[in-house]
Amino acid sequence: MKIIKKMFLAVVMLFAFASCMSGPINLTGSVAPINSSQKKVLVAYYPEHAGKWRSDLETSFGIRKWKINEIGFWEVEQTNLRKRSETFLIVVDKMIKENHQSMLGGTFFSGNISVYDLRTGNKIINYNLSTEESFDVTTRLAKALGGLVTK
């Protein structure tokens, strides 16, 4: 009987953990596919917590062989982005660090991330995160943009 209770508890905990995980990040509208040579992103970080987001984004995109360049957060509006060689602009807006405890650790944030297609100038992702771990968000973001790469 104790074994059955432990197994039932393990299944309930597994479902509880799985239900707390966020789904994939979806693109808004249609976006033209890219080839491997266009795997370049330009990133603008809001100065507060930029180090954490930079580290996680470089890891998530670096593993997938994306080239990453940075631009100052306040320079985005003044720069002619059409002349840049990157394909996408990722803007990590001001993030609020959450005091959230989890079994796995991690740093949790709430805020907004926008992604623009620099070929068209259109916003393709507007992701409002709420108490999510930064590495999970950057990994899902890399997967969403990686889905546009043709083989």
Language-model-derived ranges and their functions:
Residues 1-8:
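Bacterial N-terminal signal peptides that target proteins for export
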Residues 9, 32, 102-104:
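Residues embedded in well-ordered secondary-structure elements
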Residues 50-54, 104-106, 130-138:
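Solvent-exposed, acidic/flexible segments
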Residues 63-64, 73-131:
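Surface-exposed short loop/turn segments
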Residues 10-18:
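Bacterial N-terminal signal peptides
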Residues 3, 18-70:
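A structural "domain/chain start" motif
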